[in-house]
Amino acid sequence: MESQRSFLLIGLAMVSFLLWQQWQVDYGPQPAQPVESQQTTGSDAPNSNGDVPIATPTNKSALPTQSVVGKVISVTTDTLQLSINTVGGDVISANLLKYPLEQGSQGTYSLLRPSGPTIFVAQSGLVGTNGIDKGSRPTYSVSQDSFVMEGDSLTVPLTYTAKSGLLVTKEFIFSKNSHEVKVNYHVENTSSDVKSVKQFGQLKQSTADQGGSMFMPTYRGGAFSTEDERYEKYSFDDMQDKNLNQVTPAGWTAMIEHYFVSAWVPPQDQTNSLYSKMTQNGNAIIGFIGQSVDIEPGQSVDIQSSLYLGPKDQDTLEKIARGLDLTVDYGFLWWISKYLFAFLQFIHSLIGNWGFSIILITIVVKGAMYPLTKAQYESMAKMRALKPKMDALKERYGDDKQKMQQAMMEMYKKDKVNPMGGCFPLLLQMPIFLALYWVLLESVELRHANFIFWITDLSVKDPYFVLPILTGLSMYLLQKLQPMTMTDPMQQKIMQFMPVAMSLFFFIFPAGLVLYWLISNIITLIQAKIIYASMEKRGLKTK
């Protein structure tokens, strides 16, 4: 029985640590909001040619000698508000219009930011032998300073005429109710020579600390996908140690943060080069370079890619590219979590409230686990019934551990008791519970999700700490219901203090998680009462 108690204590400690780790992801301070700017200059601006993935020409006189000032155009759709610099045609800011910065606030979540210590921009262009971004960034022409979507789609064209004879129209194509932006290059060759270009797309983000926890840093970094690896994180430290260099059919690259993702998806029917690098001023870059495209004299081609700027919506991401939905990081239990999330989504589609959906899925999961819970309690009861015999064996054999162990095994065999019978059911249940925790922590659907009364956001802590206090009380009642047979005073004190310690943790956990734990404890209390009543009828001791 003592070993089972120790196992439960270790398991609870592991869950607490994992919850604390994931809480850091939830509560990392939001990045500073950008100041509106109509032009971008300086070495930190996204028009710096040093960011372009292909090496600059050996003729140093061809390099830009000063920063180029670009005009910033505004694009507004039903989901996005973007700023695009005409130098390079880079997306230098992106606000997600359907995602408030804070619940009830007028400000929207800023995913891309143009400058300063939190710079995060999406760059793209044409490199290769005749690429217009090869020696310096092109300055595009545009017909107007702002574009607003009025129908189901919007196309924003930027044009550039190169001295080499290439006429380039860079189009940003938006669709209603979508966070995916199609980036299309229409390239016409007016010269008498064959021209060769390669498309690139990359994300540049500052690696500077943005106020994460002193205990556990928030994961904010790169990720990529290849034919062999559907999803692989590539952190800023990884980029610092070694540049990413992968050649793969299809693939994609991304920068990830909690609830949101920015990703470049190149053509999926060609081979692409994925890369990363660190700039001298501490910015991380991850991106792709497409295949070389030859353009015959008098001919034109279209070269397209996709830029996703939005929430980690699994259904949407799965349709855009293979493995992109895995940026919703459920950890090593993702293969369980994805089915639990699908079930949670189904319940929500029926009742329309995420809080009640959490309650219902907890009831279903605990109900499905009831046979295991019953086996666990009955095994523990059988072990308690053997305690007098175990005490007698300890008194008989004293310090002779070998004989003591042999005698105990014979006793277990004779009484048909599995000493680990109380642990195995718990081992089977723990992955289910942990997987559901990841779902509640990682799913953007719970961000700013209302429940009832004072709980208006399930992704943040209970403002009045009602749920944590009730959860601590439920843990105390569970502890009283389950007799403590351990004799070690230190273990007894630790177990007695556990409800208080967990309540303190729950004070800072998201309300959705605490709600899940509270309902789980209440159901466990009810199940324990039923199981104990059944055991008493069969003559098994429950205390």
UniProtKB/Swiss-Prot annotation:
Protein's membrane topology: Multi-pass membrane protein
Region feature (Disordered): 30-61
Database matches in InterPro entries: Membr_insert_YidC, Membr_insert_YidC_N, YidC/ALB3/OXA1/COX18, YidC/Oxa/ALB_C, YidC_ALB_C, YidC_periplasmic_sf
Subcellular location as annotated: Cell inner membrane
Gene Ontology biological process terms in this record: protein insertion into membrane; protein transport
Compositionally biased residues, Polar residues: 35-61
CDD domains for this protein: 5TM_YidC_Alb3, EcYidC-like_peri
Coiled-coil positions: none
A single GO cellular-component term on record: plasma membrane
Transmembrane segment boundaries: 7-27, 341-361, 421-441, 451-471, 499-519
GO molecular function, one term: membrane insertase activity
Annotated keywords: Cell inner membrane, Cell membrane, Chaperone, Membrane, Protein transport, Transmembrane, Transmembrane helix, Transport
Subunit structure: Interacts with the Sec translocase complex via SecD. Specifically interacts with transmembrane segments of nascent integral membrane proteins during membrane integration.
Xref: HAMAP family: YidC_type1
Function: Required for the insertion and/or proper folding and/or complex formation of integral membrane proteins into the membrane. Involved in integration of membrane proteins that insert both dependently and independently of the Sec translocase complex, as well as at least some lipoproteins. Aids folding of multispanning membrane proteins.
NCBIfam families the UniProt entry points to: PRK01318.1-1, PRK01318.1-3, yidC_nterm, yidC_oxa1_cterm
Family in the record: Belongs to the OXA1/ALB3/YidC family. Type 1 subfamily.
Name of this chain's protein: Membrane protein insertase YidC
Organism: Pseudoalteromonas atlantica (strain T6c / ATCC BAA-1087)
